[in-house]
Amino acid sequence: EYAYSLGHFKSDNCEADDVVSIWAQEALDAKEHFVIAHIDKDIDMVEGWHYNFNKETVYYICEDQGYYKMCIQMLTGDSTDSIQGLVGIGPKKAEKLLSLCYGKDKMLAKVQEAWQKAHPEDWKERLETCWNLIYMRRDWDSFHRLTIEETLNDSV
């Protein structure tokens, strides 16, 4: 009852993570100050100031760091959210694969290369599915599923 009395926000067709990401993008665009308080590692893909209330830490994620974290998840998957990554690629191997990739286009190219190697017949469909499950929306209008071409265009 207490939380309800403070007001709430109902979102149809949008996960809470996406709402946070959209609001963060709106704040960035408006040059407003904000801090995202959370314990969800997925939110670390979102640019801006973060506060982890379990660890009591404040830190900043820049755009490239957020994209890097997303690419790590595109390789490893996310067992909590039942998102399948690439077999045999855990966090350490994913970090090693991306270690010499500077810039979004290079990171995404490395992710694409890994998916092509693991699934030569249907890598494109699998990668697009993974992208659409992991990518956090930046605006209210992006309801459609992305294709690999749109994914590549979004990365630059």
Each PLM stretch: what is its role?
Residues E1-S155:
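Extended two-metal-dependent nuclease catalytic cores across DNA- and RNA-processing enzymes
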